[in-house]
Amino acid sequence: MRKINFSAGPSTLPLEILEQAQKELCDYQGRGYSIMEISHRTKVFEEVHFGAQEKAKKLYGLNDDYEVLFLQGGASLQFAMIPMNLALNGICEYANTGVWTKKAIKEAQILGVNVKTVASSEESNFNHIPRVEFRDNADYAYICSNNTIYGTQYQNYPKTKTPLIVDASSDFFSRKVDFSNIALFYGGVQKNAGISGLSCIFIRKDMLERSKNKQIPSMLNYLTHAENQSLFNTPPTFAIYMFILEMDWLLNQGGLDKVHEKNSQKAAMLYECIDLSNGFYKGHADKKDRSLMNVSFNIAKNKDLEPLFVKEAEEAGMIGLKGHRILGGIRASIYNALNLDQVKTLCEFMKEFQGKYA
C-alpha cells in the first residue's frame, strides 16, 4: 500500500505517471529500448525534449517572446546565473522572504553585484510577505514566489516597470501566472512537475541580449543554452521524460486554472483544521500570506508532542510531515499530486491526535 507523501521535495508523483514510467522503463513506446539508453541527439528523444518545452509554454499561455531552457544544477545554480547574466551596472533589488532569497542575495554579493534588499520579513521569522516597492530603474527585481520552509506565498506578484525575476520552485505549475512584467521565471521541477535533476527556466528573449559580450563561462551563459535549444551538453534525459509526463497530466487535469482550484480546496481544508483546533495547532504564516503548497504549523500547547505526531502519522501511513530543521514543527506539503481525499485523511488524523492529547 502506498504511503501518503507530504514531503517538501522531491515529492509525491501522480500514480498514473509512475505506472506509465514503469511500463515504458525497459521498452519505450514499443521501440525495444529505454528512453534512458538513447542519445539526446536522436529524433526520438528530441520529440520528448521539444514537446516538453512546448507543453510547458502552453500551460502558462506563453508565446514565442519566451525561451524555455532546461538546465541542471538545481534552482540554486540560478542564484548565481541570474546576476552573472542579467546584472548590468546598476542596482539589483531583492525582497528577502526566506532562506532561498537569502541564498540568492549571498550569491549575487559574491559576484560583486550591487545588491539592495528592499524589503524583508526576517525580523518576524519570515511569517509574512512584506510590502515591497521596487524602483523603476533597477537592473532587475527579484522575489521568491513561495517559501517552502515558512509556508508563505505571494498571492499576487509586485507590479514593476523593472524586469521581474521569480523563483517559483515550490509553486511551479500550481496556478496561472500573469507574465506581463516577468523577465525570468524559474524553478527546480522536483516538487510540482517531475523529479530532481532538472530546472526549467522561462526567459524573455530580449533579456538574452544582456548575456552578449559578457565574460561568462559557456555553461553558465543563458545565451549558450538558448542558441543550442538546451542541448549544448547532454541534458538530464530521464528527468525531461518525466517532466513531459507531468505536463501531459496537468493538461489532462484541465490546465492550471483547474489545478489551482483543487489546490485551493486542499489548502482551505487543512487551514480550517488548524484554525478550528481551539489553539491546539497554530500556523506559522500570517493568514493573508498563507501558502497553498506548504502548510507549516506547531502544536502550540505542547511542542514536545510534535515528534509523537510525526511518528503516529507515519504509523497511520503518512510520511514527510517533520518540519524543516530551521523552523521545526510540522509541515505538510500539499503539491499538485496530492488529492483532496489524502489531505482529508491528514485532517482526520489531526483531529484524532488532538482528541487524544489536548
From Swiss-Prot:
Cofactor: pyridoxal 5'-phosphate
Residues holding L-glutamate: 41
N6-(pyridoxal phosphate)lysine: residues carrying this PTM: 191
Assigned GO CC terms: cytoplasm
EC number: 2.6.1.52
Classification via InterPro entries: Aminotrans_V_dom, Pser_aminoTfrase, PyrdxlP-dep_Trfase, PyrdxlP-dep_Trfase_major, PyrdxlP-dep_Trfase_small
Pfam families: Aminotran_5 (PF00266)
Pathway in which this enzyme or protein is active: Amino-acid biosynthesis; L-serine biosynthesis; L-serine from 3-phospho-D-glycerate: step 2/3; Cofactor biosynthesis; pyridoxine 5'-phosphate biosynthesis; pyridoxine 5'-phosphate from D-erythrose 4-phosphate: step 3/5
Location(s) in or outside the cell: Cytoplasm
Enzyme class name: transferase
Function: Catalyzes the reversible conversion of 3-phosphohydroxypyruvate to phosphoserine and of 3-hydroxy-2-oxo-4-phosphonooxybutanoate to phosphohydroxythreonine.
Binding-site list for pyridoxal 5'-phosphate: 75-76, 100, 148, 167, 190, 233-234
Protein name per its UniProtKB record: Phosphoserine aminotransferase
Cofactor binding note of this UniProt entry: Binds 1 pyridoxal phosphate per subunit.
GN (gene name): serC
Organism encoding this protein: Campylobacter jejuni (strain RM1221)
One of the record's GO molecular function terms: O-phospho-L-serine:2-oxoglutarate aminotransferase activity
Family membership: Belongs to the class-V pyridoxal-phosphate-dependent aminotransferase family. SerC subfamily.
